[in-house]
């Protein structure tokens, strides 16, 4: 994922 992009943040997590």
From Swiss-Prot:
Q: Where in the cell is it found?
A: Secreted
This entry carries the following GO cellular component terms, namely: extracellular region
Alphabetical GO biological process terms: neuropeptide signaling pathway
Query: Which residues are annotated as modified residue Phenylalanine amide in the UniProt record?
Result: 4
Q: Which keywords annotate this record?
A: Amidation, Neuropeptide, Secreted
**Major localisation:** secreted
Keyword check for Secreted, yes or no.
yes
Q: Which domain of life is it from?
A: Eukaryota
- On whether Nucleotidyltransferase is a keyword of this UniProt record, the answer is no
Q: Which family does it belong to?
A: Belongs to the FARP (FMRFamide related peptide) family.
Identify this protein by name.
FMRFamide-like neuropeptide YLRF-amide
